[in-house]
Amino acid sequence: MLPLGVTMFGERVADVFHPGDHGTTFGGNPVCCAGAVNILSRIDDRLLEGVRERSDYLRRTLQAAPGIRSVTGMGLMLGLEIDIPAREFAERALREGVLVTTAKQKIRLLPALNIPMELLKTAAQALVHCAAE
């Protein structure tokens, strides 16, 4: 894994930052940038359709689960508002073999865009179990 941080701005705010005004620990590394260019060149309609399919499945499954109040986000980058403390949910998920992160009282899901559907289904069922436990 190569760390890379990116910040993008639209035209409305483009004149706010000038070279040297904003930096990031993971920004500008030539090796990481070369890796990012390679990955971006691999994004195609087939990959994006797979992301839509996986996202739809994950949303449907989690929205129907008792103990999960809401599912928000875009694509496979999702946030779960849950009935129990986020840390407790994260610990349950880890015991089930699913690594999640927390943000205040939300659970953050960030699976790989190309996660195999069977693995995603296994993880989703584990999360449903964690919410209902």
Predicted features by range, described:
Residues 1-133:
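Conserved N-terminal phosphate-binding loop of PLP-dependent enzymes in the Aspartate aminotransferase
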